[in-house]
Design a protein with these regions (language model features):
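Metal-dependent DNA phosphodiester-chemistry modules and their immediately adjacent helices/loops
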Residues: 160
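Nucleotide/phosphate-binding catalytic cleft detector across ATP-hydrolyzing
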Residues: 1-155, 163-180
Length: 180
């Protein structure tokens, strides 16, 4: 069946953002950095281009990491960063994509809502969330629907998540703010 929309997977990490497009694989792997003109608020660069500016900018240009410890610390900048990355990998699209975004297992409902809202405002038709250990297990080819426990450890740039997964869900999990 032909689909007008794209399905996108996004790892919105503290250190980097990865974007996966169905049938294409990983199409973006860039640092979670945004360069802004602090006088005007204008977004100048995102990702690797913004990271290259760290420590090398005049006083009116600042480089920001809008995620801290696995969650959004600057909502508006995160939304703009997601929008730029989506435009970079998709160009202009008549139909909005569905996006599944990885989140740490221990985030609050408010933090979940912020991720969903940022994705919608950035141009997604629908945003789904998946816990990082579950996404890691699926990515590793583990059949998480089986009645077997699998311990998964996901060490990211802002959090480390540990979970036992069985029968399609998380049995127990912990997320700590210590990471690589």
């Amino acid at each position: 069946m032909f689909s007008f929309t794209k399905d996108i997977g996004m790892d919105l990490g503290t250190a980097s953002v990865l974007i996966y497009i169905k049938d294409k694989g990983i199409v973006l792997n860039e640092p979670s950095v945004v360069a802004l003109d602090k006088n005007t608020g204008k977004l100048l660069k995102v990702g690797a281009d913004a990271q290259a500016m760290l420590g090398r900018t005049p006083g009116n240009i600042i480089a920001i990491r809008p995620l801290r410890e696995g969650v959004i610390s600057d909502y508006e900048v995160t939304e703009r960063m997601i929008k730029e990355f989506l435009h970079k990998v998709m160009g202009f699209q008549l139909f909005k994509p569905r996006i599944i975004i990885c989140v740490p297992s221990g985030i609050t409902e408010v933090e979940e809502r912020a991720v969903i809202d940022a994705g919608i405002q950035a141009g997604a038709r629908r945003v789904y969330l998946i816990e990082e250990p579950v996404a890691a297990a699926i990515g590793a080819g583990i059949d998480i629907t089986q009645p077997e426990g699998h311990m998964i450890i996901d060490i990211g740039g802002g959090t480390s998540d540990i979970a036992v997964i069985s029968l399609g869900g998380t049995v127990v999990s912990a997320s700590i703010k210590i990471a690589g």
